[in-house]
Amino acid sequence: MLVYIAGSGAMGCRFGYQISKTNNDVILLDNWEDHINAIKENGLVVTGDVEETVKLPIMKPTEATQEADLIILFTKAMQLPQMLQDIKGIIGKETKVLCLLNGLGHEDVIRQYIPEHNILMGVTVWTAGLEGPGRAHLQGVGALNLQSMDPNNQDAGHQVADLLNKANLNATYDENVVPNIWRKACVNGTMNSTCALLDCTIGELFASEDGLKMVKEIIHEFVIVGQAEGVELNEEEITQYVMDTSVKAAHHYPSMHQDLVQNHRLTEIDFINGAVNTKGEKLGINTPYCRMITELVHAKEAVLNIQ
């Protein structure tokens, strides 16, 4: 199969690297010039659990011409419509598109470009880091769940899961992936924005009594909005999952902290807490915590003059 990685940041590099070890062809797509040039000139330098340099083709999305069998989306949420527009030329009648983006509502965007028959939605707990252009740091293990959005095309989902398992990516075909997507979004909604605004680690947030109160209110808002949309969510179970994750990730600054505080980049807030607030408004459900957090993050972006 010919697999394109649409958005070859840290996670895209992990998936591209691991899939390239199977008998499938991989092409990385990205718009970051320095990253593209580094990989073209020196290969992708992998550090962490393995130290290796691999030659992988990389190009801008608009330069890709060969029809894809599978496209894995790893772009930033706000760049998704542009990416789908840019890769229209490599999408054939049977091209499968797997979305592994953080956050909520991406399927609504993807449906505008791809028939439901070919859409796969997933969620992953793999992690990865970029040490600079063309340098990926891959450590630890992870897993992912995915599902075909078309109930009559489950075979496609199983086929993609098999391919990912050959790449040791620990994929599970999930008959009901949407609650898992919401659960991960809730983890991000309790940790990402809050740690970015408070400039603290996950452990520091959860050690604060007021921080914990806020976390529980955010979880409640995610759960009531998700349930109103027909998603099976158990507040007690999700709270436990968030607490467990906070212990494992106690020393980490989450990705939104990296974006907002460390690198002064736009955040994905509109697809996490912002999405819950927007959905809540449509459903007549008040979500004051998610609304305020979204406004604060946007205000911080404006204060820092991030565009």
Swiss-Prot record:
A Gene Ontology BP annotation from the UniProt entry: pantothenate biosynthetic process
Pathway the protein contributes to: Cofactor biosynthesis; (R)-pantothenate biosynthesis; (R)-pantoate from 3-methyl-2-oxobutanoate: step 2/2
Enzyme class: oxidoreductase
Gene Ontology MF annotations: 2-dehydropantoate 2-reductase activity; NADP binding
Keywords of this entry: Cytoplasm, NADP, Oxidoreductase, Pantothenate biosynthesis
Pfam families: ApbA, ApbA_C
Residues annotated to bind NADP(+): 7-12, 102, 128, 268
One cellular component term from this protein's GO annotations in UniProt: cytoplasm
Signal peptide: none
Function: Catalyzes the NADPH-dependent reduction of ketopantoate into pantoic acid.
Family, per entry: Belongs to the ketopantoate reductase family.
PANTHER family: 2-DEHYDROPANTOATE 2-REDUCTASE, 2-DEHYDROPANTOATE 2-REDUCTASE-RELATED
Designated name of the protein: 2-dehydropantoate 2-reductase
Gene giving rise to this polypeptide: apbA
